[in-house]
A protein has these predicted regions:
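N-terminal, positively charged/glycine-rich alpha-helical extensions of SAM-dependent methyltransferases
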Residues: 1-26
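Class I SAM-dependent methyltransferase SAM/SAH-binding core
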Residues: 59-93, 97
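A conserved beta-strand element that flanks and buttresses the S-adenosyl-L-methionine
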Residues: 113
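Short, glycine-/aromatic-enriched active-site segment of Class I SAM-dependent methyltransferases
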Residues: 143-160
Length: 243
């Protein structure tokens, strides 16, 4: 299965039951709306009214609140037809339906953003090369390996590629980007996110349990049961690269 098929098998209506009306599909933390909190954390790195290219924009949750709260001009890129249609039909912001490996922006952006989407890239160096002439700031919220215990089956099920931090930094240094900010989140965000997913997955009817929804439930239970090992092996960090 390819990434586009993986994200096209479940409708936004089903996803709202699991991740809320803003359709933030990522890890969260804090009090109240934990998924929104995770996006708000990024505001400190993005000036108001910035132009933002949201790479792997999902159903537009991040771009929607950046536009609403910060007055940003957001353009999204997604490989998913379902996600692209949802963003366009709801007039959230301009969206490009494309594989990032085949996409080269035709304008300059203040920020390029990857929120838990960099891990889906098969050739991250190619994608970074494609966008590197269009921005001087790239922000990642991304998973990374902390040990050599690679959870291959879990990662493969999610069509992910997880690198060590030094590998990620090397992708950027080859294009003259320097790491200017790094913060770890997984040790305080994994547990509340898993509990949030599991609680909401109970609202999904059996007929609505697509392959993606089934995988999320299995994964959430796996993460809950193996939390200590996961946190030893995998991190989730905000990384800001600039030049």
């Amino acid at each position: 299965m390819e990434v586009d098929e993986f994200y096209d098998d479940t409708s936004p209506e089903i996803w709202r039951k699991v991740i809320g009306n803003d359709l933030h599909y990522h890890v969260g933390w804090g009090d109240g709306d934990i998924l929104y909190n995770a996006v708000k954390h990024l505001y400190q790195f993005i000036d108001k009214k910035s132009s933002v290219l949201d790479c792997g924009c999902g159903w537009g949750g991040t771009g929607k609140v950046l536009k609403r709260d910060m007055g940003c001009e957001v353009t999204g890129v997604t490989i998913s037809q379902v996600q692209s249609d949802y963003i366009s039909d709801n007039n959230l912001f301009p969206v490009v339906l494309s594989d990032l490996h085949d996409y080269t922006p035709d304008t300059i952006y203040d920020v390029c953003l990857f929120v838990e989407s960099f891990c889906h890239l098969k050739l991250p160096q190619k994608v970074l090369s494609n966008i590197s002439n269009s921005t001087n700031k790239i922000i990642l919220r991304e998973y990374h390996m902390k040990s050599n215990e690679h959870p291959k089956k879990y990662v493969d099920n999610w069509l992910m590629n997880i690198y060590h931090l030094d590998e990620i930094c090397s992708f950027f240094s080859k294009l003259d980007f320097k790491l200017t900010y790094e913060e770890e989140h997984y040790y305080y965000s994994l547990e509340p996110t898993v509990e949030y997913w599991l609680q909401n997955l109970d609202k999904v009817d059996s007929i609505e349990r697509t392959k993606h929804i089934q995988l999320l439930e299995l994964s959430a239970r796996y993460l809950k049961q193996n939390k200590d090992q996961i946190l030893r092996d995998i991190g989730l960090a905000t990384l800001v690269f600039e030049r």
